[in-house]
Structure formats: structure tokens, C-alpha cells
Amino acid sequence: MEQFDQLVLNSISAKALKSYLTTKIAEAIDELAAKKNSPKKKAQTKKPENRIPLDLINKNFVSKFGLKGYKDGVLNSLICSLVENNYFENGKLKRGKHDELVLLDIEKEILARIDENSSLNIDVLDVKVLANRLRTNADRFEFKGHTYYLEQNKTEDIINQLIKNSAISMDMKNTIKDTFYMISDELLDVFKNRLFKCPQVKDNIISRARLYEYFIKATKPDDSKIYVILKDDNIAKILNIETIVIDHFIYTKHSLLVSSISNQIDKYSKKFNDQFYSSISEYIKDNEKINLSKVIEYLTISTVKIENTVE
């Protein structure tokens, strides 16, 4: 019993005791009400993490960290952990040459020009980008004795080959406005393990349109960015973010841009506040249900992505 409680109970005053008990009861009721009304977190079932096949990971990276023994593939979380623990110090990319990491020429140039305290430094928020660059998309997969080659702009050929080899079959019951296929768990496992993710299916049924979209994404090169080019320096002033000019282009960090914009979006209305929108409406014409990816597109200049192959 607390000292204050003891003093109250030692008091002869019935009035004081009544007041004390009333207060305690009220506090207990408030506490129960708060617990009852607090949102309960739904138990989330964690999906098993995919393993990246060794032949799809940078060979120098595999060799340096002795990953050749991982015959069933390497967890992506392990790759991220190795990158962060070996190439980063105090939350930032270590200075110097890193032969295993894939850094674009413009990224190397920016790092060479900025000081260690700059917010433009590559930091732990970029670990996932660097880890993803250490793997490449599969150019083929095998299923029941047949090899299927994944090439951009040849998605129709892949689907037709799967049908020809009876790897997938038409679902006549659901095929009305769109063609639907039945796809086995076995083939879905091949997709998950070789192409890093599964297409969206329901009861092993998938539409041709959705399967087509899946293969388009599976053959698309990684386009994750660390730095982006702003359309003009006024954007940087509005968002109050650091930039660097190289060859007349204004560069900033993608993560800085995303963070700054996100801070201006109301989480309930999904809109910018009026004052901020007024300052940036020259670039963003619509303030209804802001799409962050689209906003980034409006504020930046598209660049040609030079594909980095995994060796």
C-alpha cells in the first residue's frame, strides 16, 4: 500500500474516506474502459521467407561470405544482414571501394562529392536496395521436364507454351468474359522459389490477364533508386531537402523525397494540407487521395536505367 493510501485510511473523517474511495473507483472504471476500447492487434501469420537460388546471387558476394553451402538458396534477410553488418558503419555506407556491391557511376560520384555528415549519404534505409541489386531475375524456369525462357515482350509465348505442355489448363467453368486457368501448387512453388513471388490465385484459379501481368513483372529489371533527379530546385526549397547538382541535374535521395512528402499527407483524408498543396500545385494537379508513387513521378525526371548483371 502506498504512503498516500495509508494516510487516507488512517483518517477518521468518513467524508475524506468516501471521497478517496469514489476517486479510486472512478480510476478503476476509466482503466477498464480504456482497455476495452483499445484496438486489439490481429494476430498476423508470418509468411515463410523465400530463398534466393545461388545462381541468381552475385558470385563475388557468394564467394566472399561463404554462401556456396546454401544449396537450397539464401534467405533475403540474410543477404540484407550481411550487407548492413559488413558495409555500413554508424548507420552509413563505409567509405572506400566495395567490389561486391552494385553502385551506379552517378552514385559513386555523389558519394565522392559529399561529406560524411550529409543527408545524401547512402544509409541503412538503402540496405534493401543494395541487397536487391545483388540478385538478378531468373531468365528461365523448369517444370516437369520442360524449360521455359523468360524474355521481355514474349509473355504470350510463355503462357502458350505452358498450355501446350499441360502445365496449366483452361478452367471452363469460370471462363466467360476472360480466360481462366487452373494452376497446380507444384507450379506455384516453382514460381515462388525461382521468380521470388507467386501470382495471385484463388483456389488455384487465375485469369489470363493476371497471369500475363505476373510474367511482365517477373521479367522487368529492378528499378529501385537511391538517388533521383528533381525537375527544378524550387521543389527542394518547398520540401526543405538537401540536393547536389551534377552536370546541371539536381539530385536528391529518393528516401528523403519520400519521407518529406509523406509528412505532408493527412493520414485520414489522404490529402495534402491546403498551405502545402498551394506551394506545390504547379507540379501536382490533383489533391484527391494522394498516390505517393505518382507524386514522386510528377516531381522527378525519369532516367534510363542501365541494367546491372549479376556475375
UniProtKB/Swiss-Prot annotation:
It is found in: Virion. Induction: Expressed late in the viral replicative cycle. It comes from the Viruses. Keywords: DNA-binding, Late protein, Virion. Its main location: virion. Signal peptide: none annotated. It holds the Pfam family Pox_I1. GO terms for cellular component: virion component. Belongs to the chordopoxvirinae I1 family. Each virion contains approximately 670 molecules of I1. Late DNA-binding protein which binds to the hairpin form of the viral telomeric sequence. Required for the production of mature virions (MV). This is Telomere-binding protein I1 homolog.
